[in-house]
Amino acid sequence: MLKKTFAALALGTALLSAGQAMAAEYKIDKEGQHAFVDWKISHLGYSFIHGTFKDFDGNFSWDSAKPEASKISVDLKTASLWSNHAERDKHIASADFLDVKKYPDAKFVSTSVKSTGDKTADVTGDLTMHGVTKPVTFKATFNGEGKDPWGGERAGFNATTTLNLNDFGIKGPGATSQTLDLDISVEGVKQK
């Protein structure tokens, strides 16, 4: 009787395990310049300033059969901001805005992924920036996955969101500069 019970338990466990999707782990390919964290903010309501953060790292888990089980974590060095204008970058990095000396890091950790279409999802998580943690939702698009020419496997995504800087204790220079658009493009290398 004990043998039959154990065999049934083992078979049930095997069937349950086979039915569960296994998310693969990916490292964001920043070193190969296949990942970007770009931003855009209004300049006096007349135009937009575009920039990027050059120093960040992260990883994500992904299973195309079960995207809701995906997770992502990104760490960013705020002093790595770049807008192609050294004096402006210095001002944005100052205590007037990002205060990168006091707040050198920003971090996003997902808490949920909700599919919104065949290749789209809302990725919600906690964004910590300027010493404040707030929930943020990114609109994400799955670009594709497959083998690369170097024998590895990759998956790629784009994600966008708009942040209200006041929510993070950052005072923009005027009413037209209170929101910041983030556009993230990542390609991850599957970890073995």
From Swiss-Prot:
Tree of life domain: Bacteria
The subcellular localization recorded is: Periplasm
The stretch of residues making up the signal peptide is 1-23
Membrane-spanning segments: none
Alphabetically list the UniProt keywords: Periplasm, Signal
The entry's cellular-component GO terms read: periplasmic space
Does the record's keyword annotation contain Signal? Answer: yes
Q: Belongs to which family? A: Belongs to the UPF0312 family. Type 1 subfamily.
**Stored NCBIfam families:** PRK03757.1
> What name is this protein filed under?
UPF0312 protein PP_4981
Give the species this sequence originates from: Pseudomonas putida (strain ATCC 47054 / DSM 6125 / CFBP 8728 / NCIMB 11950 / KT2440)
